[in-house]
Design a protein with these regions (language model features):
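FIC/Doc superfamily catalytic core
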Residues: 1-199
């Protein structure tokens, strides 16, 4: 069962917004588990769940890795036959660097790399923003307060987001892992979120 945007855009938009609210509720549960379990709680099952809830009733292929090509502007993500391997590497890199990288580094890497792989048919950006916040909170040891949390701030500040993605992509194309622009971007948005609470 799913709704097509072209059939009823208002209804589609309402379902999409409800899905986003449900994703944030699930994300909060995931963060609470991550605060107790640490790096072992970050796995593909959590990623599948976050993606599935984001596209429930608007896409038939939510919550599983894509099995077809996908194109994102000028970026060509890995071939679908390579997605599972790239995701294993991604998850392993997060887990192995959990206590090495700063929380903003871990979150920035997650935000960039998941977008670079683009493992899902739909809602890669929504899933990556949720993962970013999960990593930031779970690695920091706190569920940060906010009336407007980081994923919403990223969604509203697309220029900085897209610029940081492109910078990390260029570095990777040149043979370097450098997501420092993304880290600065994430840190700035977190500061703005915490400033609302005088933190």
């Amino acid at each position: 069962m799913f709704v097509l945007e072209k059939e009823d855009k208002d209804f589609f938009d309402r379902i999409q917004e409800q899905n986003l609210n449900r994703q944030y509720e699930l994300l909060t549960n995931c963060i609470e588990i991550g605060l107790k379990k640490g790096p072992a709680s970050f796995d593909k099952y959590m990623l599948w769940a976050l993606n599935h809830v984001a596209v429930a009733n608007i896409s038939q292929f939510g919550g599983r890795f894509r099995k077809e090509p996908i194109y994102v502007g000028n970026h060509i993500p890995p071939h679908f036959n390579e997605v599972a391997d790239w995701m294993d590497r991604f998850i392993s890199n997060i887990q192995e660097n959990w206590y090495i990288w700063e929380p903003t580094e871990l979150a920035a890497y997650g935000l960039w790399r998941l977008n670079w792989i683009h493992p899902f048919i739909e809602a890669n950006g929504r899933t990556a923003r949720a993962v970013c916040y999960y990593l930031l909170c779970a690695r920091s040891g706190a569920l940060f307060p906010g009336t407007k949390i980081l994923p919403e701030r990223i969604r509203e500040n697309r220029h900085g987001y897209e610029s940081a993605l492109l910078a990390a992509d260029r570095a990777w194309d040149d043979g370097h892992l450098d997501f420092s622009d993304m880290e600065a971007y994430v840190a700035g948005l977190l500061d703005a979120q915490l400033a609302e609470f005088g933190l």
